Amino acid sequence: MGKRKTKEDNASEDYDANELMIVPGEKRKKLEKSGEKSATGGKKNRNFAKEKEVAKLTKQAKRKLAAVQSRKALKQTQEELFAGLAEFQLDPSKLCQLSSSTKLSKEPEKAPVFPEKLKVFSGKTKTEAKRTQQDYYPTDDESSSEEEEEEEEGDNDIEDAGNTVEVKIEPIDLDDVDEAIDGNPETNLDQIVVKREDDEESDNEDILALPTTTVINRKKVIVERSKEIQKSRAELPIFAEEMRIVEAINENLVTVVCGETGSGKTTQIPQFLYEAGYASEGELIGITEPRRVAAIAMAQRVGVELAKPDEVSYQIRYEGTRSETTNILFMTDGVLMKEMEQDVMLKKYSVILIDEAHERSMYSDVLIGMLSRIVPLRSKTARPLRLVIMSATLRLDDFTHKKLFPLLTPKVIKVDARQFPVSVHFEKRTPDDYIASAFRKTCRIHETLPPGAILVFVTGQHEVKQLITKLKKRYPVVYETDKNGEVLVKGTKEWKEKKVEAAKSIKLEDFKEETPETEDFEDVDDGLMDGDDMNERGAAEAFDDYEEFENGDGDLSDGKVENSIGAPPADCEPLYCLPLYSLLSMGKQRRVFDETPAGMRLCVISTNVAETSLTIPGVKYVIDGGFEKRRLYDSITGVSRFAVCRISQASGDQRAGRAGRISAGHAYRLYSSAVYQDFVKFADPEILSKPADQLVLHLKSMNIVKVVNFPFPSAPDEQMLESAEKRLCRLGALSESTKNGKTEARITKLGKTLAVFPLAPSYAKFIAMADQHNLMSHAILLISLLSVREPLIPVSSLRGDTPEETKELMKNVLKERRRWCSHTGARRLGDLKVLMHAASVAEQIKYNARECEKVGLRVKALVEARKLRQQLTNIVNASCKKEHAAALDSDLPPPTDQQAQLLRQMVVASFSDRLARRVDRSVGQEEVQKGAYETTLIKGHVFIDPCSVVFTEEPEFVIYQELVQVNEKKLMTSVCAVDKEWLSRLAESYCNYGEQDKNQEPIYDPVKDMVVKTVKVTFGPLNWELPNENRSVPHDIMMYRYFALFLLDGLVFEKLKEYTPKLLAPPSTMVKSWAKLQKRTEMLLNKLIEKEVTTRSSLKEQWLKNENWLLEEYLEWVPESVHQQISLMWPPLEDHEKTIKMGRNKKY
């Protein structure tokens, strides 16, 4: 405390004071980087900067300084060299379009270039340009001193999670970095980002979240083509875009190619990718088509152009040519969906092309949604997957929105079509009858305008036939024979030349009366007559509809149009009229592609099938009626109907574009421009207008529980998806379960079985049930016929040469169909039996077109049904373990009475939602039309189709396959009669059960094997009354008491009945309020509760495990005198129910 300070102490205090004065000097980092040690002490006011200048450099420092100076000199020389080369550099706008072959697209698409720098190191670059690709390279970190750098060399590399720019990857000395900064004061220091430890976690999350584009060095393929093929390819608009398209696909995970129909997208892009090496390492190039015809035709065309038909295959619903040598595979979108169920990552494919995406079919929309999640996952593997969406319209928002592709932005490439200019002509006033207007417009074009094919768009087959009939009548094909015996067609160019020559050498004696021979150019049995389907309008009464059709309606039928435009010119050339619609046979559809007879003008009358699916050659004039016939489906009620609706603006533009394929054309729109402006821009996609049951089931089978959250390009209505889930739950394909307070519908074992079949779930269930009674062949036959469109020609569409012949033909066909199901047992199977017999008749006559048409069969639909039948047979044999494989029997015998009854019961179990009940006209004051039915789906009355074989019988309950609205009526098609008593047992999920009467005594139902009470039963929301039903009592202690009562009473096991009179207490003791006071009742009750035994089957299971189970408890109820007898008999099963081991472990 009182110690005196010495001189040394004072010196120490001075030293400490000086130390405090130089502490701030440590903060100057640049001094630390010089390599000299910092001061630790010294004299007061010491000048360290001056001492550093005069200090001698060590040998090591001199070497480092010399190295730095040499690098600076080298850098200056290289900068001068780069400055000289920059004079010969391409313009940046052209340079960005080229792709480097040395970097293999490791850079982002719009990577900034730094030509003024010698070297560029990796690091985060703050730019506004949006990056679509990322690679992560290590880079050197800055250290606080050179000594720390030498000590920690190799440990300070970091991984940058930002966008990187890499010109040359090599080790970089920090001295170079310092010199670059010092020598270039304009360098942005923010470009050099040092990762901090606290940023590591977030950067890792970014790496996982954002997909990367890995470009693989693929082996290019050289293809040798003929000169003709090369010339035809060069004429396509897309051919000049090969480099741009291939580079975009290489550098982007998803690419959208937009080009007009006919630009060559479908045939050329697969060849571009093939040559780029996308199939060089055993992977496939997959192309999906919405139609089977397109898949087959495109595969054949690409195979010819590549000169390698073995490497280009197709796979459609019923057939395919896929083999081990296949490299390019065309398929329908449904085929790829089924393949995705087995391999969700599509590991066999290197690229998937979705063609005709603008048509928005249900499967293509689901495929795009699935691939939008698969592509980012595959990008993290060694073999990434590319997705190419090809569309013919500019509606691209549906394919690029963020909900569909949240982690990336698809690259959009627009291909300009080599379209000739098309002049679009609107009507000043929209006509009321567009058919009459189309007829007038066709006549004026044919009579006044230059040559060129005419394409007329109408709504349906009825309009096609009506217009062709009038045009053929006005412009018939007339044959004349000249004096040399040569047959010529009147009006053709050759005929006119012959007339001129004949006029020069005319003589009076050559004149004589001749009658020209007039006949149709086509045969009488042209598919035009037979292909009509007036059932779209309806068939209230067959011949009445026929007369209405023949009489016609509007101006076109009464001759006013012909009178208004006058007679055609005498030398007018004939008009070669052809129909085109979807139900026309393939052979007759192909006639529009054949060469037009010489001297005639082609005129195609078509539905909207010619809008995008087919390109008709030579079309110069298009007449657009502005209407189309759509099949509208109510997702809630299930009612479908055909309705004539206005087209969309996109459809109108597609139709007009058909006129500009070969030369400048004209499009005549039979509506005003104001009406066109009122059209919707785009039609609703198919996924919004079709039942979603099959869609939901397929998504559930892929473990997609929340279908509502699926990334659809155009999301269906939530109510539509929920209704589909409810129907699937009632069908047994889904089951609802609650987890964490949330109710979810998950797929069941039955649902997984149904998802195997390419059918609606109700149809698939019908086949799944058929194996129980050896009805698989009959079930497959019936479902294949129900799955195709109209295998039977509607009676109202049949035609004869005269009205009398037509009436007789309708009568005979309807009589023949009723004869097919005249057998007593099969009659109630109704129209389903007619379909099965029709297939048998078609097999017998070998699907001969003429013979089938005589009995009212549509050959095209029956052939399609046979292919589906073969496919379903193969699926059953491959997927189901059966002792006897199902066979495609062409001589399948008709179902017997018992089989017909079983088939009707299967119909009830599978199609319960399509039940209808006949309205009792004697009940209620409202006047009800005869033959009216009511159904659970819609309000109002429905009726059986008059052409149905059960039309006259009017069963009380029927099940239909479809409701079709015809005029003011809703008609049920494919009707089958069912029994009322089956509903509560086979359609239990649709039944409503009343409350059990508390005063009613339960009984044991040996059929259901449960303790039951009788309750009232009603069906559906309309509460149709059904016979009373026995329902299980609540699962509580009283259920166990009553089961024990019936067990003691001998009602459960017949062998115990003889001991009932000998019981020490009546069995009713079990249900008394004081029963727990007796030991025997509690012992028996507790034993049953312990194993939860309330049925005969569950009790039998316990005896199979332990044959003495419940013996001790039962012996408490009987006298001791019968104990040994009961012990020998126990368990009281029938002899055939006992196993061999029973009796070895008896207790006596």
Curated annotation (Swiss-Prot):
Residues that hold ATP according to the record: G259, E260, T261, G262, S263, G264, K265, T266
InterPro entries noted in UniProt: DEAD-box_helicase_OB_fold, DEAD/DEAH_box_helicase_dom, DHX37-like_C, DNA/RNA_helicase_DEAH_CS, HA2_WH, Helicase-assoc_dom, Helicase_ATP-bd, Helicase_C-like
Annotated spans, Disordered: 1-51, 101-163
Keyword Transcription: no
Catalytic activity from the UniProt record: ATP + H2O = ADP + phosphate + H(+)
PROSITE patterns (UniProt xref): DEAH_ATP_HELICASE, HELICASE_ATP_BIND_1, HELICASE_CTER
Residue stretches making up the Helicase ATP-binding domain: 246-412
Domain Helicase C-terminal span(s) in chain numbering: 463-703
EC assignment: 3.6.4.13
Any one GO MF annotation of this record: helicase activity
GO cellular component: nucleolus
Broad class of enzyme this protein falls into: hydrolase
Keywords: ATP-binding, Helicase, Hydrolase, Nucleotide-binding, RNA-binding
Superkingdom to which the source organism belongs: Eukaryota
Compositionally biased tracts (Basic and acidic residues): 1-10
Amino acid composition bias (Acidic residues), ranges on this chain: 138-160
Ranges spanned by the short sequence motif DEAH box, renumbered to the chain: 355-358
Biological process, per Gene Ontology: maturation of SSU-rRNA from tricistronic rRNA transcript (SSU-rRNA, 5.8S rRNA, LSU-rRNA)
Keyword Ion transport: no
Family listed: Belongs to the DEAD box helicase family. DEAH subfamily.
Function noted in UniProt: Probable ATP-binding RNA helicase.
Protein name: Putative ATP-dependent RNA helicase rha-2
